[in-house]
């Protein structure tokens, strides 16, 4: 958080999508790496 860089676990919207967004591919560019915690 803080940077506009999309990290694994954080959506491009700046909202923490946790595993829901990660597994759904809602991550920035559809990150194919679902985080086990979302942190």
From Swiss-Prot:
Instruction: Spell out the protein name for this chain.
Output: Natriuretic peptide HsNP-a
**Family per similarity comment:** Belongs to the natriuretic peptide family.
Q: What exactly does this protein do?
A: Snake venom natriuretic peptide that targets both NPR1 and NPR2. Exhibits hypotensive and vasodepressor activities.
PROSITE patterns noted in UniProt? NATRIURETIC_PEPTIDE
Q: Give its localization.
A: Secreted
What species is this protein from?
A: Hoplocephalus stephensii
UniProt keyword Secreted, yes or no: yes
- Propiece residues: 1-8
The family database entries (InterPro entries) matched by this protein are listed as:
Natr_peptide, Natr_peptide_CS, Natriuretic_peptide_brain
- Provide a GO biological process annotation: regulation of blood pressure
GO CC, one annotated term: extracellular region
Give me the disulphide-bonded residues: 12-28
Q: Name one GO molecular function term.
A: toxin activity
Tissue distribution: Expressed by the venom gland.
List the keywords (alphabetical): Disulfide bond, Hypotensive agent, Secreted, Toxin, Vasoactive, Vasodilator
């Amino acid at each position: 958080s803080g940077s506009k860089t999309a990290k694994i676990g954080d959506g491009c919207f700046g909202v923490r999508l946790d595993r829901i967004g990660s597994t759904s591919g809602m991550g920035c560019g559809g990150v194919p790496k679902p985080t086990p915690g979302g942190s």
